[in-house]
Amino acid sequence: MMQESVLAQLDVSRETSEKLSHFVALVEKWNKAVNLIGRSTVDSIWTRHVLDSAQLRTHLASQPRLWLDLGSGSGFPGIVVAIMAAYESPESRFVLVESDQRKATFLRTACRELKLSASVLAARIESLPPQKADVISARALAALPDLCALAAPHLAPNGICLFPKGVGHISEIAAARQSWNMEVETLPSLTDPDAVILKLKALAHV
């Protein structure tokens, strides 16, 4: 029922629904050997992870040429947004960065099986050449000051960052502003009344 409810809320095509379901099955299968998501969240995977990831696409002003997902891990949000873009904006490319080799192998398997326009970089974010991304996302990766430092070298001139955050987001913004100039829009989360999505623009070091 949770699956049907989330898919209805997302209002996606049959093909997209099938790919999202396929991806969830892959996560559940691999999670037994590789710690992709917390075991306590498996039963709520459709709301806690799929919907929480998919909502990021609702905050785009235009379809990105390149979407960079940092610390992709289990593929939330990277794989989910790539699945949704496959039919809505097939020209968009996705780059998923994950330094853990086992998780990177999972991500490559998912991209291959789902036939996504996505590539996986099994490397540390700090070692990458500038990616010039239109959108950068990161979920449960680091505090905002650190996310700004990781993202800034890879943003296109008019690029945005989409960072889901929890109850401590106000203090994280204050801490980040000590070192970074930015425009911040705080957007409500569909999955948690205490959570937000931080949309950052014009990110530059002080």
Curated annotation (Swiss-Prot):
Record bears the keyword rRNA processing: yes
Gene3D superfamilies xrefs? Vaccinia Virus protein VP39 (3.40.50.150)
List keywords of the entry alphabetically: Cytoplasm, Methyltransferase, rRNA processing, S-adenosyl-L-methionine, Transferase
Where is this chain's protein located in or outside the cell?
A: Cytoplasm
Q: Which residues bind S-adenosyl-L-methionine?
A: 71, 76, 125-126, 139
Reaction(s) this enzyme catalyzes, per UniProt: guanosine(527) in 16S rRNA + S-adenosyl-L-methionine = N(7)-methylguanosine(527) in 16S rRNA + S-adenosyl-L-homocysteine
Which top-level group of life is the source organism from?
Bacteria
From the Swiss-Prot or TrEMBL record, what is one GO molecular function term?
Answer: rRNA (guanine-N7-)-methyltransferase activity
Which GO CC terms are listed, alphabetically?
Answer: cytosol
Its signal peptide is none
> What single Pfam family name could you report for this chain, choosing any that match?
GidB
State which Enzyme Commission number(s) the record gives: 2.1.1.170
Q: Function of this protein?
A: Specifically methylates the N7 position of guanine in position 527 of 16S rRNA.
HAMAP family, sorted: 16SrRNA_methyltr_G
Q: Which family does it belong to?
A: Belongs to the methyltransferase superfamily. RNA methyltransferase RsmG family.
Instruction: Note the PANTHER family from the entry.
Output: S-ADENOSYL-L-METHIONINE-DEPENDENT METHYLTRANSFERASES SUPERFAMILY PROTEIN
This chain belongs to the protein called Ribosomal RNA small subunit methyltransferase G
Q: Which organism is it from?
A: Cereibacter sphaeroides (strain ATCC 17023 / DSM 158 / JCM 6121 / CCUG 31486 / LMG 2827 / NBRC 12203 / NCIMB 8253 / ATH 2.4.1.)
**Highest lineage ranks of the organism?**
Bacteria, Pseudomonadati, Pseudomonadota, Alphaproteobacteria, Rhodobacterales
